[in-house]
From Swiss-Prot:
GO CC annotations, alphabetized: mitochondrial inner membrane; respiratory chain complex III
Sorted UniProt keywords: Electron transport, Heme, Iron, Membrane, Metal-binding, Mitochondrion, Mitochondrion inner membrane, Respiratory chain, Transmembrane, Transmembrane helix, Transport, Ubiquinone
Residues reported to bind heme b b566: H97, H196
Cofactor(s) for this UniProt protein: heme b
Name this protein carries in UniProt: Cytochrome b
Origin superkingdom: Eukaryota
Gene Ontology biological process terms, A to Z: mitochondrial electron transport, ubiquinol to cytochrome c
The keyword Protein biosynthesis is assigned to this record: no
Function of the molecule: Component of the ubiquinol-cytochrome c reductase complex (complex III or cytochrome b-c1 complex) that is part of the mitochondrial respiratory chain. The b-c1 complex mediates electron transfer from ubiquinol to cytochrome c. Contributes to the generation of a proton gradient across the mitochondrial membrane that is then used for ATP synthesis.
Residues bound to a ubiquinone: H201
Source organism of this protein record: Antechinus godmani
Further facts: Heme 1 (or BL or b562) is low-potential and absorbs at about 562 nm, and heme 2 (or BH or b566) is high-potential and absorbs at about 566 nm.
Length: 381
């Protein structure tokens, strides 16, 4: 009997990707976040689709259309809360996924890693334009502050900012095009995610030890499908707890007020998942310098594969690198906290020190730790 799963042109692709895929037998729960990100993307596309049915991208009606969704549309409040908190879950999974990649040396699959960094940037762009759509105070002023950064680019900056705005300030044209971007970008993310998987399946998955796992592989189904299902249940549990019990805890109270260009909020700040980058941006008292640091904070991920100096791939057996990794984690949490604080002492100096340490750890200390560990592992007799 012919097995359709292995012969049908379409089923064959699914089979090789999710069923008969040879997978290392020792990958831990840290390898769950790829599938969870896929689920997050599906949730965001579905909830976003239903929100788009009722949303109007016009400055006069955008805010009231969001209120209408929450008050008058059947389960509109739930769809909106799932979408808003789904974004937070998306970024939580993203940060853990990237952290896993750094810890276990997965970045040495350069193509997969580079596509991943492009994916991260695209998701960040999508979240930014999406945050502008409710047209609350923080939506408007966040859009104004961030798009204004383009004007720091020498010579073409001002023209570029006005081109993005579609006028001389953030207004109706900006909101309309941001809605268009927010609708199209998730599909671009889906395409990039498929390419990400394509490159990953060229090499096969990494594993916690960092050693070539070819000698000991197991089929993806049922072992990892059941493991991913457990991760999915936990993700949905946390998302539902957030969306049903404290849907506004991660948002900004200022966004409950309609956008007013004549009234600036006392503290303009983005959503929590951008605060680390926002802190790095603010730590440099120069507009262009801040913009470059902001870009570098994400693009620095692209140089990590070229700075790998250790003889071992994973940090599993490298205590010095492990220590630096957890210092980097603590540093990012510190930056996130600083990004949400007002621009005054002692927050300014803490932010500047944390920003310096961020780049120092990735570009200097971690490569040096790799060399030091190589030296320590050499026989001394």
């Amino acid at each position: 009997m012919i097995n359709l799963r292995k012969t049908h042109p379409l089923m064959k692709i699914i089979n090789h990707s999710f069923i008969d895929l040879p997978t290392p037998s020792n990958t831990s729960a840290w390898w769950n976040f790829g599938s969870l990100l896929g689920v997050c993307l599906i949730i965001q596309i579905l909830t976003g689709f239903f929100l788009a049915m009722h949303y109007t991208s016009d400055t006069l009606t955008a805010f009231s259309s969001v209120a209408h969704i929450c008050r008058d549309v059947n389960y509109g409040w739930l769809v909106r809360n799932l979408h808003a908190n789904g974004a937070s879950m998306f970024f939580m999974c993203l940060f853990l996924h990237v952290g896993r990649g750094i810890y276990y040396g997965s970045y040495l699959y350069k193509e997969t890693w580079n596509i991943g960094v492009i994916l991260l940037l695209t998701v960040m762009a999508t979240a930014f334009v999406g945050y502008v759509l409710p047209w609350g105070q923080m939506s408007f002023w966040g859009a104004t502050v961030i798009t204004n950064l383009l004007s720091a680019i020498p010579y073409i900056g001002t023209s570029l900012a006005e081109w993005i705005w579609g006028g001389f300030a953030v207004d109706k044209a900006t909101l309309t095009r941001f809605f268009a971007f927010h609708f199209i970008l998730p599909f671009i993310i889906t395409a990039l995610a498929i390419v990400h998987l394509l490159f990953l399946h060229e090499t096969g998955s990494n594993n916690p030890s960092g050693i070539n796992p070819d000698a000991d592989k197991i089929p993806f189904h049922p072992y990892y499908t059941i493991k991913d299902a457990l991760g999915l249940m936990l993700l949905l549990l946390i998302l539902l707890l957030l969306a049903l019990f404290s849907p506004d805890s991660l948002g900004d109270p200022d966004n409950f007020s309609p956008a007013n260009p004549l009234n600036t909020p006392p503290h303009i700040k983005p959503e929590w998942y951008f605060l680390f980058a926002y802190a790095i941006l603010r730590s440099i008292p120069n507009k262009l310098g801040g913009v470059l640091a902001l870009l570098a904070s994400i693009l620095v991920l692209l140089v990590i594969p070229f700075l790998h100096t250790a003889n071992q791939r994973s940090m599993m057996f490298r205590p010095v690198s492990q220590t630096l990794f957890w210092i980097l984690t603590a540093n990012l949490i510190t930056l996130t906290w600083i990004g949400g604080q007002p621009v005054e002492q002692p927050f300014i100096i803490i932010g500047q020190l944390a920003s310096m340490l961020y780049f120092l750890l990735i570009l200097v200390l971690m490569p040096l730790a790799g060399l030091f560990e190589n030296y320590m592992l050499k026989p001394k007799w």
